[in-house]
Design a protein with these regions (language model features):
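Flexible, solvent-exposed loop/hinge segments and secondary-structure transition points
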Residues: 2-109, 117, 121
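Buried, small/hydrophobic-residue-enriched core segments of structured protein domains
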Residues: 4, 91-95, 102-173
Length: 173
């Protein structure tokens, strides 16, 4: 399947996986950045290694990692792999700019092609939670109608500002 925006529509067709756990393993190539697909090919040919991802935002957010962690655990289970996940903040906690929210350790072959979807799941939920709270705190006596797609808009854009650092390690966290 080619890696383009039109292929994202295919994710919604004929999928038995729950909506919140999409994309499923067979759909990942259509939503994964080409860089990560090529990296997986290279690692596959030269040998796997243990990596640790430290995921953080370049702006303040609220920790809203549960959907991303649920998705990651389901994908890892489907692939019959193992990862070590270390959360740095409780769900709903304030997270400062640059503070690691989560560390994920495991096989690079297992994790590398999950990065695009994982970062989108983390970025969207954490920014949306922060923006929603900011609106409520700013306008305490106002009722709100949820326009979910708009919560991530603003100065930083929908997913801009999410960064992931990957360390090559020999030990788990």
């Amino acid at each position: 399947m080619s890696n383009n925006k039109n292929s994202n529509i295919e994710i919604l067709k004929n999928d038995s996986w729950p909506l919140e756990l999409r994309p499923n393993p067979s759909q990942l190539p259509s939503v994964t950045d080409t860089y990560f697909l090529k990296t997986k090919e290279i690692v596959s040919s030269y040998g796997d290694t243990e990596v640790t991802y430290a995921i953080f935002m370049r702006r303040p957010v609220i920790s809203a990692l549960n959907p991303a962690i649920d998705w990651l655990e389901e994908i890892v289970k489907e692939r019959k792999g193992n990862v070590n996940i270390k959360r740095c903040f409780k769900e709903g906690s304030d997270v400062g700019a640059g503070e690691p929210m989560i560390y994920i350790s495991g096989s690079m072959l297992l994790l590398v092609d999950l990065e695009t979807a994982l970062l989108q799941k983390i970025g969207a939920t954490c920014v949306a939670a922060y923006n929603a709270r900011s609106m409520v705190e700013s306008l305490r006596k106002t009722s709100f109608l949820a326009m979910d797609a708009r919560h991530c808009a603003g100065r930083y854009g929908r997913f801009n500002g999410l960064w992931c650092v990957c360390w090559f390690t020999k030990s788990k966290i």
